[in-house]
C-alpha cells in the first residue's frame, strides 16, 4: 500500500492558541512553565489530528516557539556575541529574535519565496558551534508517546542552513563544522527508535543549489557512513530540484520532490529512471494554496510516476505552515466556495483519499470530493473578465518634470520625514472592531471611533513635526485583507490565519472570482485626515502584486491577468483620491520581490508583469501628484532595474535589519528617483538612539543625494505600542533636523 507523509503542520492552532500563549508570556502574564505546558498540549493535539487523518509519517520538529531556523541556531550555539550576557535559556532565544533594550535583533528574511520569515543565523569569528541541547530528540520522545513509530523527525539540512546564514567566510568549512553535531542529533534519534529522518534542503531548488552539489555528496556520504541505520529523506520544495541526475545518486533512502511548483521538470527526471532504486516522496497536494485538489488529474499524475520509482509516498508539496488550519469555522462562505477550499486538515484528508484511490479503492469520500471540486469550477463567479487596457495610460512624464511640479506644490524640506502608513492598533481599537463585527456596535459609532483615532494621531504627528502625515489605517486589520473586503472577487475568512513571523499572523483574503472596484476603498478616512491638517496626508493603498502575493489567489487564470484585474481596480481608487485633493498616494508593493520565481530563467517574465501592473494602477495621475511605494525585506540589487522601471516618485525600503546591506545596492547602481531607506527597525520594541539614525542617514547620503532622500521607519508601526512609536519618531525627527543643520552648514 502507498503511504502518506506530511512535511509540517501549522503552529498557530485552530484559534491561534500558540500566538496567544507566546504573547502572554512576553507580556509577563504567563509563567514559563505554563507556556511550556500550553505549547506541549498544542503539539500533542497536532500529532493526534494527523494520526487520526491517516498520516503514516508525522513530522516532529516542525513546531517552534518562534522559528525553526532559530531553533537550529540555538541548538547548535550559533548565537551572536552581543547576547553573551544571557544564560542559554528562553529569554536569550526571544532576545535574538526580537532584540532587547541594548541589542538589535538578528536579521529577518523571507523563507524563499513565501511570506514566512526566518531569523538569519549570524556567524562571527567567535562562533563556536556545539550541540547545546538535542531539542529534536526531546520532541521525538514526546511524539512517540502519542503516535508511536509514525513519528518522523524533521530538520533543516546543513547546506540550506549555512546558505541562509550571514557572516560566512568559508562555506564548505562552515558546513563541515556542523556535521559532527548533525551526526550526534541523528544518532540520538536512531537510538531512541526513529527510522525515517526528513532533512529539508530547499536550497537545491534555487540556482545557487547548482554550485553546491559536490558539497552535498560529501555531506550525505558522511551521514550515510556515520549513521547507516537512518532512512534519510532528502526533501526539496517550492520548485523543481536542480541537478537531479547527480543528487539522485546521494546515499539516502528517499527524495521529496514538489510536483505542484516544479511538476514538468521533476516528472521528467522521474521518467528518466533516476529514482528506480529510491523511495519517492511526491508532493502532489499544494501546500501553499487553499483550493481543493483535482483528484482525477492528480491520480493520473501518480499513475505516471508509479512505474518509475521503488516505492511511492504521497505528501503535500511543502510544509502546511503556509495555509490555515481548518475550514470548519468558515460557515459564512457560499457553500460552493467553502466546499472548494482545502486548508491543512482538509489537505491531509485529500492525501488519504488519493492514497486509497491509487491502491484501487475510490471511496464514497473520493467521489464526493470530486463533485465539490467540479461545482467550484462551474461557478458563475469565475469568468476571467478583464477590462480593455487600450485606454489605460502606461507612462508618465519624465521624472525631472514631475519632481519640479511636485516640489512646487508640496513645499517640503530636504530629507522629508514620514512614516510608512500604519500606527499602533491598541487593545481598544481591536475591542471596538470586534464589537462592530459582532453587531454590538453600530456602523456610525464605529466610524466615529475611527475618526477619533485619526484625529488624535494627526495631532500627534503634527506635534512630532513630521512633514508628510498618514491617517493611520485604524480601520484595517491588515494591508491586504481590508481591500479583500471591499473589492469584488474577494472574500475573507473568520479563522484563516497563517504565521508570517514570530507571533505575527496574517489572514490572507481569498481571490475566488473576477476582481472589480465596486466602492471606495479608503477615500473617506483619507479625505477626513487631510481636512484636519495643512500638511500633506498620503493616501494609502496596497498594490496589485502585493495583494496577489499576500492572498490565496485563484488558480484557474494566469497571474498576469490577475495582476491586471487588480491594477485596474486600484487605478479607480487612485483617481478618486486624486479628484478629492490628495496630493501624495502610496501604492505599497511590499511583497513584490517575495513573488520572484526561485529560478533566474523565470524571473524576468514575472518582473515585467509586475511592472506593467503597477503602471496600469499608477500612471494615469497628474504630474504633480506624487506616487510613493514601499517594499519589504529583499535582495534589491537583483531587481533594481525593475524597481526603477516602476517609475514611482518615491520608494521606501525596509533596510534596518539588513544592517546596511541593501544600501550597498545603491552604492553600485545609480537610482534617480526619490527614496527612503528605513532608518530604524520597527519589528523590535527597542527605541533607536539619535546617533544610530544619524549614522544611517549619513551613510545613505554617501550614495543618494539630499534632494532625493526621505527619512522614515522601515515598515508600518501597527504592531508597536503607542509609547514606543512616539518615542522612536521623536528620535527620528530630532536626528533628521540635526543632519539638515549639518548640511546647511
From Swiss-Prot:
Taxon lineage: Bacteria, Bacillati, Bacillota, Bacilli, Lactobacillales
Keyword annotations from UniProtKB, A to Z: Amino-acid biosynthesis, Metal-binding, Methionine biosynthesis, Methyltransferase, Repeat, Transferase, Zinc
Any Gene Ontology biological process: methylation
Cysteine disulfide partners in this protein: none
Taxonomic source organism: Streptococcus agalactiae serotype V (strain ATCC BAA-611 / 2603 V/R)
Identification of the protein by name: 5-methyltetrahydropteroyltriglutamate--homocysteine methyltransferase
EC number: 2.1.1.14
Free-text remark on how the cofactor is bound: Binds 1 zinc ion per subunit.
Gene name in the database record: metE
InterPro entries, per database record: Cbl-indep_Met_Synth_N, Cobalamin-indep_Met_synthase, Met_Synth_C/arc, UROD/MetE-like_sf
